Amino acid sequence: MQQFRFIDLFAGIGGFRLGLEAVGGVCVASAEIDQQAIKVYRQNWPTDGVDHNLGDITAIQQLPAHDVLVGGVPCQPWSIAGKNQAFDDPRGQLWADVIRLVQINQPKAFIFENVKGLVDPRNRLCLEIILDSFKDLGYSVFYKLLNSFDFGVAQNRDRVFIVGIQQKLDLNGFSFPEYTESEQRLYHILDNLEVPETKLESIPIQRNLFGERIDVGYNKLTPRGAFNDFFILNDIRNGPTSIHSWEIYPTTEREKQICMIIMRNRRNSRYGDCDGNPMSYQDIAELVAGLAEKELQTLVEKRILRQYPDGKYEFFNRRLSGGIDGTYRIFLPNARFFGTLTARGMHDEIAEISVSGANAEEYKHNFIQQVLIPKRYRKITVSEAARLQGFPGSFQFHSNQSANFRLIGNSVAPPVIVALGKALQCVKLFEQELCEV
Protein backbone atom coordinates (compact mmCIF):
# COMPACT_ATOMS: atom_id res chain seq x y z
CA MET A 1 0.00 0.00 0.00
CA GLN A 2 1.40 3.39 -1.02
CA GLN A 3 1.73 5.75 1.93
CA PHE A 4 1.19 9.50 1.67
CA ARG A 5 0.68 12.47 3.97
CA PHE A 6 -2.47 14.55 3.91
CA ILE A 7 -4.01 17.56 5.67
CA ASP A 8 -7.71 17.50 6.52
CA LEU A 9 -9.29 20.96 6.04
CA PHE A 10 -12.84 21.59 7.25
CA ALA A 11 -12.30 18.25 8.96
CA GLY A 12 -15.70 17.92 10.61
CA ILE A 13 -15.81 14.55 12.34
CA GLY A 14 -13.23 12.95 10.06
CA GLY A 15 -14.96 11.48 7.03
CA PHE A 16 -12.02 12.31 4.77
CA ARG A 17 -9.56 10.99 7.34
CA LEU A 18 -11.33 7.65 7.70
CA GLY A 19 -11.32 7.16 3.95
CA LEU A 20 -7.72 8.16 3.28
CA GLU A 21 -6.25 6.29 6.24
CA ALA A 22 -7.88 3.14 4.85
CA VAL A 23 -5.70 3.42 1.73
CA GLY A 24 -2.38 4.32 3.37
CA GLY A 25 -2.81 8.00 4.15
CA VAL A 26 -1.21 9.56 7.23
CA CYS A 27 -2.92 12.68 8.58
CA VAL A 28 -0.35 15.29 9.64
CA ALA A 29 -2.84 18.03 10.59
CA SER A 30 -6.49 19.02 10.46
CA ALA A 31 -8.42 22.28 10.54
CA GLU A 32 -11.83 22.71 12.16
CA ILE A 33 -13.57 25.40 14.22
CA ASP A 34 -16.85 23.68 15.16
CA GLN A 35 -16.37 22.70 18.81
CA GLN A 36 -18.76 19.75 18.70
CA ALA A 37 -17.02 18.39 15.61
CA ILE A 38 -13.62 18.89 17.24
CA LYS A 39 -14.74 16.92 20.28
CA VAL A 40 -15.85 13.96 18.15
CA TYR A 41 -12.67 14.14 16.06
CA ARG A 42 -10.47 14.03 19.16
CA GLN A 43 -12.44 11.13 20.63
CA ASN A 44 -11.58 9.06 17.59
CA TRP A 45 -8.05 10.39 17.04
CA PRO A 46 -6.54 11.35 20.43
CA THR A 47 -3.95 14.11 20.27
CA ASP A 48 -1.30 12.37 22.41
CA GLY A 49 -0.59 15.72 24.04
CA VAL A 50 -0.02 17.56 20.74
CA ASP A 51 -2.94 19.42 19.20
CA HIS A 52 -2.72 19.10 15.42
CA ASN A 53 -5.86 21.17 14.80
CA LEU A 54 -4.81 24.25 12.84
CA GLY A 55 -8.08 26.03 13.59
CA ASP A 56 -9.49 28.74 11.33
CA ILE A 57 -8.11 28.36 7.80
CA THR A 58 -8.54 32.07 7.12
CA ALA A 59 -5.64 32.69 9.52
CA ILE A 60 -3.37 29.93 8.17
CA GLN A 61 -0.46 30.53 5.82
CA GLN A 62 2.18 27.78 5.80
CA LEU A 63 0.96 24.22 6.31
CA PRO A 64 2.98 21.25 7.61
CA ALA A 65 4.65 19.17 4.88
CA HIS A 66 2.08 17.05 3.07
CA ASP A 67 1.31 15.38 -0.25
CA VAL A 68 -2.46 15.81 -0.51
CA LEU A 69 -4.75 18.59 0.70
CA VAL A 70 -8.38 17.60 1.22
CA GLY A 71 -11.60 19.03 2.59
CA GLY A 72 -15.32 19.46 2.28
CA VAL A 73 -15.53 23.19 1.62
CA PRO A 74 -18.64 24.66 3.29
CA CYS A 75 -21.24 25.41 0.64
CA GLN A 76 -22.56 28.84 -0.18
CA PRO A 77 -26.01 29.73 -1.51
CA TRP A 78 -25.09 29.33 -5.17
CA SER A 79 -26.91 32.33 -6.57
CA ILE A 80 -23.99 34.52 -7.61
CA ALA A 81 -24.80 37.07 -10.31
CA GLY A 82 -21.35 37.86 -11.64
CA LYS A 83 -17.64 37.25 -11.33
CA ASN A 84 -17.01 40.27 -9.11
CA GLN A 85 -19.48 38.97 -6.52
CA ALA A 86 -18.46 35.32 -6.82
CA PHE A 87 -16.84 35.08 -3.40
CA ASP A 88 -18.56 37.91 -1.54
CA ASP A 89 -20.57 35.49 0.58
CA PRO A 90 -18.50 34.44 3.65
CA ARG A 91 -18.86 30.79 2.66
CA GLY A 92 -17.79 31.58 -0.86
CA GLN A 93 -14.77 33.39 0.55
CA LEU A 94 -13.61 30.08 2.01
CA TRP A 95 -12.98 28.87 -1.54
CA ALA A 96 -10.63 31.84 -1.96
CA ASP A 97 -8.81 30.76 1.21
CA VAL A 98 -8.53 27.19 -0.07
CA ILE A 99 -7.08 28.44 -3.36
CA ARG A 100 -4.65 30.64 -1.40
CA LEU A 101 -3.45 27.67 0.67
CA VAL A 102 -2.93 25.58 -2.46
CA GLN A 103 -0.91 28.42 -3.99
CA ILE A 104 1.31 28.84 -0.93
CA ASN A 105 1.86 25.16 -0.12
CA GLN A 106 1.75 23.49 -3.55
CA PRO A 107 0.55 20.00 -2.54
CA LYS A 108 1.08 17.22 -5.08
CA ALA A 109 -2.67 16.80 -5.25
CA PHE A 110 -5.93 17.91 -3.67
CA ILE A 111 -9.47 16.60 -3.28
CA PHE A 112 -12.28 19.01 -2.42
CA GLU A 113 -15.96 18.22 -1.96
CA ASN A 114 -19.05 20.40 -2.31
CA VAL A 115 -22.81 20.18 -2.75
CA LYS A 116 -24.20 19.31 -6.17
CA GLY A 117 -25.51 22.86 -6.62
CA LEU A 118 -21.99 23.88 -7.61
CA VAL A 119 -22.42 22.15 -10.99
CA ASP A 120 -25.89 23.54 -11.61
CA PRO A 121 -25.94 25.44 -14.94
CA ARG A 122 -26.97 28.58 -13.05
CA ASN A 123 -23.67 28.44 -11.17
CA ARG A 124 -21.42 27.69 -14.12
CA LEU A 125 -19.47 30.92 -13.63
CA CYS A 126 -18.66 30.08 -10.00
CA LEU A 127 -17.41 26.63 -10.95
CA GLU A 128 -15.30 28.04 -13.78
CA ILE A 129 -13.70 30.57 -11.43
CA ILE A 130 -12.72 27.81 -9.01
CA LEU A 131 -11.39 25.46 -11.72
CA ASP A 132 -9.51 28.21 -13.58
CA SER A 133 -7.93 29.42 -10.34
CA PHE A 134 -6.46 25.98 -9.69
CA LYS A 135 -5.34 25.60 -13.32
CA ASP A 136 -3.55 28.95 -13.09
CA LEU A 137 -1.61 27.54 -10.13
CA GLY A 138 -0.25 24.72 -12.30
CA TYR A 139 -2.72 21.92 -11.66
CA SER A 140 -4.55 19.52 -13.92
CA VAL A 141 -8.08 19.70 -12.57
CA PHE A 142 -10.90 17.17 -12.79
CA TYR A 143 -14.40 17.31 -11.38
CA LYS A 144 -17.38 14.98 -11.27
CA LEU A 145 -20.70 14.53 -9.51
CA LEU A 146 -20.50 11.29 -7.52
CA ASN A 147 -23.31 9.56 -5.66
CA SER A 148 -22.42 7.71 -2.46
CA PHE A 149 -24.90 5.00 -3.45
CA ASP A 150 -22.54 3.99 -6.26
CA PHE A 151 -19.80 3.21 -3.75
CA GLY A 152 -21.66 0.84 -1.47
CA VAL A 153 -23.37 3.45 0.72
CA ALA A 154 -27.14 2.95 1.08
CA GLN A 155 -27.88 6.65 0.68
CA ASN A 156 -28.87 8.82 -2.27
CA ARG A 157 -26.16 11.46 -1.82
CA ASP A 158 -24.88 13.48 -4.78
CA ARG A 159 -21.74 15.52 -4.16
CA VAL A 160 -19.24 17.29 -6.40
CA PHE A 161 -15.60 16.27 -6.10
CA ILE A 162 -12.79 18.40 -7.51
CA VAL A 163 -9.42 16.67 -7.89
CA GLY A 164 -6.21 18.43 -8.81
CA ILE A 165 -2.73 17.04 -9.60
CA GLN A 166 0.40 19.12 -10.18
CA GLN A 167 1.03 19.42 -13.92
CA LYS A 168 4.80 19.34 -13.43
CA LEU A 169 4.55 15.78 -12.12
CA ASP A 170 3.60 14.82 -15.68
CA LEU A 171 1.09 12.23 -14.52
CA ASN A 172 -1.51 11.25 -17.06
CA GLY A 173 -4.48 8.99 -16.87
CA PHE A 174 -6.36 10.08 -13.75
CA SER A 175 -9.95 8.97 -13.89
CA PHE A 176 -12.67 8.96 -11.31
CA PRO A 177 -13.38 5.58 -9.71
CA GLU A 178 -15.83 3.19 -11.30
CA TYR A 179 -19.16 2.46 -9.67
CA THR A 180 -19.66 -0.68 -7.62
CA GLU A 181 -22.79 -2.78 -7.56
CA SER A 182 -24.39 -3.52 -4.21
CA GLU A 183 -27.23 -5.85 -3.32
CA GLN A 184 -27.64 -4.48 0.20
CA ARG A 185 -31.03 -3.30 1.41
CA LEU A 186 -32.00 -1.12 4.33
CA TYR A 187 -33.00 -4.15 6.39
CA HIS A 188 -29.33 -5.23 6.18
CA ILE A 189 -28.23 -1.93 7.73
CA LEU A 190 -30.98 -0.57 9.98
CA ASP A 191 -32.24 -2.13 13.20
CA ASN A 192 -35.34 -4.22 13.93
CA LEU A 193 -36.87 -4.18 10.47
CA GLU A 194 -38.99 -6.95 9.03
CA VAL A 195 -37.22 -8.90 6.30
CA PRO A 196 -39.52 -8.89 3.26
CA GLU A 197 -40.71 -12.17 1.82
CA THR A 198 -41.44 -10.66 -1.60
CA LYS A 199 -39.12 -8.38 -3.53
CA LEU A 200 -40.82 -5.43 -5.20
CA GLU A 201 -39.11 -6.23 -8.49
CA SER A 202 -41.34 -9.34 -8.69
CA ILE A 203 -44.47 -7.18 -8.90
CA PRO A 204 -45.91 -7.56 -12.42
CA ILE A 205 -44.87 -4.93 -14.94
CA GLN A 206 -47.61 -2.38 -15.65
CA ARG A 207 -48.51 -1.81 -19.33
CA ASN A 208 -50.68 0.73 -21.12
CA LEU A 209 -53.43 0.05 -23.67
CA PHE A 210 -50.83 -0.39 -26.41
CA GLY A 211 -48.88 -2.98 -24.44
CA GLU A 212 -46.03 -0.56 -23.70
CA ARG A 213 -44.37 -0.80 -20.31
CA ILE A 214 -45.16 1.97 -17.83
CA ASP A 215 -42.07 2.88 -15.84
CA VAL A 216 -43.42 3.62 -12.39
CA GLY A 217 -40.14 4.35 -10.60
CA TYR A 218 -39.79 8.00 -9.61
CA ASN A 219 -36.14 8.03 -8.55
CA LYS A 220 -33.01 7.66 -10.67
CA LEU A 221 -31.81 4.85 -8.38
CA THR A 222 -35.01 2.85 -8.76
CA PRO A 223 -34.76 0.04 -11.37
CA ARG A 224 -36.80 0.64 -14.51
CA GLY A 225 -40.20 -1.00 -14.36
CA ALA A 226 -40.13 -1.39 -10.58
CA PHE A 227 -42.25 0.43 -8.04
CA ASN A 228 -40.51 2.91 -5.78
CA ASP A 229 -39.52 1.21 -2.55
CA PHE A 230 -40.54 4.34 -0.67
CA PHE A 231 -43.72 6.40 -0.48
CA ILE A 232 -43.93 10.18 -0.81
CA LEU A 233 -46.36 12.07 1.42
CA ASN A 234 -47.34 15.23 -0.41
CA ASP A 235 -50.34 17.11 -1.78
CA ILE A 236 -48.86 18.64 -4.92
CA ARG A 237 -47.74 15.66 -7.03
CA ASN A 238 -49.40 12.43 -8.09
CA GLY A 239 -48.13 8.95 -8.85
CA PRO A 240 -48.34 5.28 -7.81
CA THR A 241 -46.36 5.91 -4.62
CA SER A 242 -47.62 9.41 -3.77
CA ILE A 243 -49.98 9.65 -0.82
CA HIS A 244 -52.08 12.75 -0.18
CA SER A 245 -53.52 14.17 3.01
CA TRP A 246 -57.07 13.51 1.78
CA GLU A 247 -56.17 9.81 1.60
CA ILE A 248 -55.05 9.90 5.24
CA TYR A 249 -57.49 12.27 6.94
CA PRO A 250 -61.23 11.48 7.11
CA THR A 251 -62.70 12.89 3.89
CA THR A 252 -65.71 12.20 1.69
CA GLU A 253 -65.42 11.01 -1.90
CA ARG A 254 -66.59 14.45 -2.98
CA GLU A 255 -63.80 16.12 -0.99
CA LYS A 256 -61.24 13.75 -2.47
CA GLN A 257 -62.48 14.66 -5.94
CA ILE A 258 -62.20 18.39 -5.23
CA CYS A 259 -58.64 17.99 -3.97
CA MET A 260 -57.55 15.93 -6.98
CA ILE A 261 -58.99 18.53 -9.36
CA ILE A 262 -57.13 21.33 -7.58
CA MET A 263 -53.90 19.33 -7.60
CA ARG A 264 -54.14 18.59 -11.32
CA ASN A 265 -54.86 22.21 -12.29
CA ARG A 266 -52.85 24.37 -9.88
CA ARG A 267 -49.81 24.35 -12.19
CA ASN A 268 -51.80 25.67 -15.14
CA SER A 269 -50.30 28.94 -16.38
CA ARG A 270 -53.74 30.58 -16.47
CA TYR A 271 -53.61 30.78 -12.67
CA GLY A 272 -50.09 32.22 -12.41
CA ASP A 273 -46.44 31.83 -13.32
CA CYS A 274 -45.37 29.63 -10.40
CA ASP A 275 -44.97 25.86 -10.33
CA GLY A 276 -48.25 25.66 -8.44
CA ASN A 277 -50.53 28.65 -7.95
CA PRO A 278 -53.26 29.61 -5.46
CA MET A 279 -56.72 29.43 -7.03
CA SER A 280 -59.80 31.50 -6.31
CA TYR A 281 -63.20 30.04 -5.51
CA GLN A 282 -64.31 31.09 -9.01
CA ASP A 283 -61.34 29.27 -10.57
CA ILE A 284 -62.16 26.05 -8.74
CA ALA A 285 -65.91 26.38 -9.31
CA GLU A 286 -65.29 26.38 -13.07
CA LEU A 287 -63.73 22.94 -12.68
CA VAL A 288 -65.98 21.37 -10.01
CA ALA A 289 -69.68 21.18 -10.85
CA GLY A 290 -71.98 22.64 -8.20
CA LEU A 291 -69.15 23.68 -5.89
CA ALA A 292 -70.18 25.63 -2.79
CA GLU A 293 -67.53 27.76 -1.12
CA LYS A 294 -68.45 26.13 2.19
CA GLU A 295 -66.95 22.91 0.80
CA LEU A 296 -63.60 24.66 0.45
CA GLN A 297 -63.93 26.12 3.95
CA THR A 298 -64.47 22.60 5.31
CA LEU A 299 -61.20 21.51 3.69
CA VAL A 300 -59.51 24.52 5.30
CA GLU A 301 -60.84 23.40 8.70
CA LYS A 302 -59.40 19.94 8.05
CA ARG A 303 -56.00 21.54 7.31
CA ILE A 304 -55.99 20.18 3.78
CA LEU A 305 -56.41 23.63 2.20
CA ARG A 306 -55.41 27.08 3.40
CA GLN A 307 -56.92 30.43 2.43
CA TYR A 308 -54.83 33.52 1.82
CA PRO A 309 -55.91 37.10 2.68
CA ASP A 310 -56.80 37.70 -0.98
CA GLY A 311 -59.32 34.85 -0.73
CA LYS A 312 -57.43 32.36 -2.89
CA TYR A 313 -56.94 28.74 -1.86
CA GLU A 314 -53.81 26.59 -1.76
CA PHE A 315 -52.90 23.25 -0.21
CA PHE A 316 -51.94 23.48 3.44
CA ASN A 317 -48.96 21.22 2.69
CA ARG A 318 -47.77 23.23 -0.29
CA ARG A 319 -44.05 22.35 -0.16
CA LEU A 320 -43.01 19.00 -1.60
CA SER A 321 -40.11 18.33 0.79
CA GLY A 322 -42.19 19.45 3.79
CA GLY A 323 -44.35 16.36 3.46
CA ILE A 324 -47.46 15.86 5.56
CA ASP A 325 -47.40 16.27 9.35
CA GLY A 326 -43.61 16.55 9.20
CA THR A 327 -43.00 13.37 7.19
CA TYR A 328 -41.91 13.57 3.55
CA ARG A 329 -40.92 10.03 2.56
CA ILE A 330 -41.24 6.65 4.22
CA PHE A 331 -38.77 4.06 2.98
CA LEU A 332 -39.54 0.35 3.09
CA PRO A 333 -37.12 -2.17 4.65
CA ASN A 334 -36.25 -3.60 1.23
CA ALA A 335 -35.30 -0.19 -0.20
CA ARG A 336 -31.87 0.00 -1.81
CA PHE A 337 -31.14 3.44 -0.38
CA PHE A 338 -32.29 6.08 2.11
CA GLY A 339 -32.73 9.81 1.53
CA THR A 340 -29.88 12.31 1.71
CA LEU A 341 -28.69 13.01 5.24
CA THR A 342 -28.28 16.76 5.77
CA ALA A 343 -27.05 19.03 8.53
CA ARG A 344 -30.45 20.73 8.64
CA GLY A 345 -32.26 17.49 9.36
CA MET A 346 -34.64 15.54 7.19
CA HIS A 347 -38.27 14.49 6.94
CA ASP A 348 -37.62 10.91 5.82
CA GLU A 349 -38.52 7.91 7.98
CA ILE A 350 -38.29 4.12 7.80
CA ALA A 351 -41.19 1.64 7.79
CA GLU A 352 -40.87 -1.17 10.32
CA ILE A 353 -42.55 -3.74 8.08
CA SER A 354 -42.61 -4.51 4.37
CA VAL A 355 -45.59 -4.41 2.05
CA SER A 356 -46.22 -5.65 -1.46
CA GLY A 357 -49.08 -5.81 -3.93
CA ALA A 358 -50.16 -7.28 -7.25
CA ASN A 359 -50.55 -3.83 -8.80
CA ALA A 360 -50.03 -0.16 -8.01
CA GLU A 361 -53.41 0.30 -6.35
CA GLU A 362 -53.01 -2.71 -4.07
CA TYR A 363 -49.42 -1.78 -3.25
CA LYS A 364 -50.47 1.72 -2.16
CA HIS A 365 -53.57 0.48 -0.31
CA ASN A 366 -51.52 -2.06 1.65
CA PHE A 367 -48.99 0.59 2.63
CA ILE A 368 -51.67 2.98 3.90
CA GLN A 369 -53.48 0.28 5.86
CA GLN A 370 -50.49 -1.65 7.21
CA VAL A 371 -47.87 1.07 7.72
CA LEU A 372 -49.26 4.59 7.55
CA ILE A 373 -52.50 4.42 9.55
CA PRO A 374 -51.12 2.21 12.37
CA LYS A 375 -47.95 4.41 12.35
CA ARG A 376 -45.57 1.50 11.87
CA TYR A 377 -42.73 3.80 10.83
CA ARG A 378 -40.10 5.79 12.71
CA LYS A 379 -37.15 8.13 12.44
CA ILE A 380 -33.69 6.66 12.09
CA THR A 381 -31.27 6.64 15.04
CA VAL A 382 -27.83 8.26 15.21
CA SER A 383 -26.08 4.90 14.85
CA GLU A 384 -28.23 4.12 11.81
CA ALA A 385 -27.45 7.51 10.26
CA ALA A 386 -23.75 6.81 10.77
CA ARG A 387 -24.03 3.47 8.98
CA LEU A 388 -25.95 5.11 6.14
CA GLN A 389 -23.06 7.56 5.78
CA GLY A 390 -20.51 4.73 5.72
CA PHE A 391 -19.00 5.15 9.21
CA PRO A 392 -17.80 2.03 11.05
CA GLY A 393 -19.65 0.74 14.10
CA SER A 394 -16.62 1.49 16.29
CA PHE A 395 -16.78 5.23 15.61
CA GLN A 396 -17.48 7.33 18.73
CA PHE A 397 -20.01 10.15 18.52
CA HIS A 398 -21.04 13.15 20.62
CA SER A 399 -23.21 12.79 23.72
CA ASN A 400 -25.62 15.31 22.18
CA GLN A 401 -27.83 13.33 19.80
CA SER A 402 -29.13 16.38 17.90
CA ALA A 403 -25.56 17.48 17.30
CA ASN A 404 -24.72 14.04 15.92
CA PHE A 405 -27.35 14.23 13.19
CA ARG A 406 -25.98 17.62 12.14
CA LEU A 407 -22.37 16.40 12.21
CA ILE A 408 -23.14 13.24 10.25
CA GLY A 409 -25.18 15.18 7.71
CA ASN A 410 -22.26 17.57 7.21
CA SER A 411 -19.72 14.80 6.73
CA VAL A 412 -18.40 13.27 3.57
CA ALA A 413 -19.10 9.55 3.07
CA PRO A 414 -15.82 7.70 3.85
CA PRO A 415 -16.31 4.91 1.22
CA VAL A 416 -16.31 7.53 -1.55
CA ILE A 417 -13.02 8.89 -0.24
CA VAL A 418 -11.54 5.38 -0.16
CA ALA A 419 -12.32 5.05 -3.87
CA LEU A 420 -10.87 8.50 -4.67
CA GLY A 421 -7.72 7.73 -2.69
CA LYS A 422 -7.19 4.55 -4.69
CA ALA A 423 -7.76 6.46 -7.92
CA LEU A 424 -4.95 8.87 -6.98
CA GLN A 425 -2.64 5.98 -6.17
CA CYS A 426 -3.31 4.46 -9.57
CA VAL A 427 -1.65 7.37 -11.38
CA LYS A 428 1.54 6.57 -9.44
CA LEU A 429 1.37 9.85 -7.55
CA PHE A 430 3.18 8.50 -4.49
CA GLU A 431 5.24 5.58 -5.79
CA GLN A 432 6.40 4.33 -9.17
CA GLU A 433 4.36 1.15 -9.20
CA LEU A 434 1.19 -0.10 -10.80
CA CYS A 435 -1.98 -0.68 -8.86
CA GLU A 436 -5.49 -1.92 -9.40
CA VAL A 437 -8.65 -0.45 -7.93
Curated annotation (Swiss-Prot):
Active site: C75
PROSITE patterns hit by this protein: C5_MTASE_1 (PS00094), C5_MTASE_2 (PS00095), SAM_MT_C5 (PS51679)
GO molecular function annotations of the record: DNA (cytosine-5-)-methyltransferase activity; DNA binding
Keyword Membrane carried by entry: no
Catalytic activity field: a 2'-deoxycytidine in DNA + S-adenosyl-L-methionine = a 5-methyl-2'-deoxycytidine in DNA + S-adenosyl-L-homocysteine + H(+)
Domain SAM-dependent MTase C5-type: start-end pairs: 4-431
One Pfam family it belongs to: DNA_methylase
Lineage top rank: taxon: Bacteria
CDD domains noted in UniProt: Cyt_C5_DNA_methylase
Protein keywords: DNA-binding, Methyltransferase, Restriction system, S-adenosyl-L-methionine, Transferase
EC number(s) from the headed UniProt entry: 2.1.1.37
One BP term from GO: negative regulation of gene expression via chromosomal CpG island methylation
Family of the protein in this entry: Belongs to the class I-like SAM-binding methyltransferase superfamily. C5-methyltransferase family.
Annotated PANTHER family: CYTOSINE-SPECIFIC METHYLTRANSFERASE, DNA (CYTOSINE-5)-METHYLTRANSFERASE 1
Stated role: A methylase that recognizes the double-stranded sequence 5'-GGWCC-3', methylates C-? on both strands, and protects the DNA from cleavage by the HgiBI endonuclease. This system is less active than isoschizomeric RM.HgiEI.
Protein name according to UniProt: Type II methyltransferase M.HgiBI
Annotated source species: Herpetosiphon aurantiacus (Herpetosiphon giganteus)
